[in-house]
Amino acid sequence: MAKKMSSLIIIFNILLLLTTQTHAHNVTRLLANHPSFSSFSHFLTQTHLADEINRRRTITVCAVDNAAMSALTSKGYTLSTLKNILSLHVLLDYFGTKKLHQIRDGSALAATLFQATGAAPGTSGFVNITDLRGGKVGFGPDGGDLSSFFVKSIEEVPYNISIIQISRVLPSETAAAPTPAPAEMNLTGIMSAHGCKVFAETLLTNPGASKTYQESLEGGMTVFCPGDDAMKGFLPKYKNLTAPKKEAFLDFLAVPTYYSMAMLKSNNGPMNTLATDGANKFELTVQNDGEKVTLKTRINTVKIVDTLIDEQPLAIYATDKVLLPKELFKASAVEAPAPAPAPEDGDVADSPKAAKGKAKGKKKKAAPSPDNDPFGDSDSPAEGPDGEADDATADDAGAVRIIGGAKAGLVVSLLCLFASSWLL
């Protein structure tokens, strides 16, 4: 009986693992089913707000239709200002239709992405939601008029993401205020003057990456540039990369969103980079390490050691090492076990029998040391992610999916049959 119970516990744990849901929503895919919001979706992508929305849990997007967006874009706002305005329409809480009509005490203040950026003074980044007479729900910036109203629910993935339509763009003088002109910022000049000259010069020699950086700056950007010593040691490996891989690597070291240090510390988790494009994920993970902030991939971990600039829409941080994307470098070069000790001079096999007994002392080819060569074989393609991991992404509708898909379902079914037969 004890043996059966032990087996059942193992089966239960496997079932629990296979049926664990993964957070995965894609706001632009969800909006793709609704053509009347195509302009709103387009500017979520252009301002990189879509990336920020997709990586957050429990969020509400207050979308406006194409007519309302046309009225907004006709005012000639820069992309940075549009980003601030639209970020006021992203609530950091879940409000489905039911919750909107059942707000406690009839009114609630919701924090927004605009508030989270730190650019909103006081409570100007909060939105007031109030239940009005006749079933209406009004929206307005904190302290302002309730001039926009709930129209309908567009898409809901309960307690994950809710996309609702409101009647007009939320008016906010603070969000619509002019932002610093990013074109006036000399990216490479800032890097060169603060210990990242080698990286800056490398970026300048790559027209494709330089253009991507400059075009992304207006919408907000964070760069993680390796210090000069780290970059000098990496250059031989970089020079062995193909031209497309060089550009992808440089793009990987920048995130298409502005993050102050405080924001990085409060936004731990995976982030898309400028290199993120479809199947080529090129993600990095931000994680606190005490007062330090670390950046991780499957290949290595680096620490942020200095702030070069932190002025919206641009933040540049120096790192102690070169962060390596798994898409370009092999983990085996970093994670390989230490080489076996070389045999003593006297450890020479005198006979087949003796050799067999001393096989453990046989000299092996040394694996690259993480300290001396942490960059993998740049000429070889990196190993792709596990198939099961690929199955954990959102489907075409942008909804949550079960890990492993059909494969997991088959395994679960087999385990259930096994459990039933075992008990009988």
UniProtKB/Swiss-Prot annotation:
Membrane topology term: Lipid-anchor; GPI-anchor
Gene Ontology biological process terms, A to Z: root development; shoot system development
Presence of keyword Repeat: yes
Propeptide regions on this chain: 397-424
UniProt-listed PROSITE patterns: FAS1
Tissue: Preferentially expressed in flowers.
Domain FAS1 per the UniProt entry, residue ranges: 25-170, 184-323
Span of the signal peptide: 1-24
Bias-annotated ranges (Basic residues): 355-366
Disordered: region residues: 338-393
Residues annotated as glycosylated: 26, 128, 160, 186, 240
Places the protein is found: Secreted, Extracellular space, Apoplast; Cell membrane
SMART domains in UniProt: FAS1 (SM00554)
Superkingdom of the source species: Eukaryota
Keywords: Apoplast, Cell membrane, Glycoprotein, GPI-anchor, Lipoprotein, Membrane, Proteoglycan, Repeat, Secreted, Signal
Induction section of the entry: Down-regulated by abscisic acid (ABA).
Lipidation (GPI-anchor amidated aspartate): 396
Pfam families cross-referenced by the UniProt entry: Fasciclin
Biological function: May be a cell surface adhesion protein.
Family: Belongs to the fasciclin-like AGP family.
Identification of the protein by name: Fasciclin-like arabinogalactan protein 1
